[in-house]
Amino acid sequence: MKISIINSGSGNIASLKNMLSFLGYNPVVCDQVEDLNKSDFIFLPGVGSFDNVIKNLKQKNFYDYLKEKKNFDNSILIGICVGMQLLFESSEEGTEKGLNLLSGKIKKFSVKNIKVPHMGWNSVFGDNFYKNCNGKR
């Protein structure tokens, strides 16, 4: 099984790689589009500014590749943090267009008493869909 992590120039790539390694996988950090070929899973991490990560993806040619869903029809794409937001059309927190793989726009929190970004650990409970991760830390 080939697991690829896109080097989006943002995100905690080392932590993601370490977690996948801990689970017994051998993830590959990809710096160019060609590295994604024949991936079973593609992780798109990102931290910080929506626009910054989009610009990084464009600079490395990942943006155009990811916009064309047919390029990874046989792969599962998983967005983490800002990487998940990039899958949508756009964000109220930026001017760049998203990948438009999912319909919708990322909205800014309007509630003032929510601490953003949320930092720290939470309890996570799996379900049958994620049974291979059940009980793993």
What spans do the regions from the language model cover?
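Extreme N-terminal starter segment of soluble prokaryotic enzymes
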Residues: M1-S4
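Short hydrophobic segments within beta-strands
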Residues: I6-S8
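Short glycine-rich hinge loops at helix-strand junctions in the catalytic core
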Residues: G24
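Short acidic low-complexity segments
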Residues: P27-K38
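Short, Asp-centered acidic motifs that coordinate Mg2+ and/or phosphate
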Residues: F41
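Cysteine-nucleophile active-site neighborhood
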Residues: G48-H118
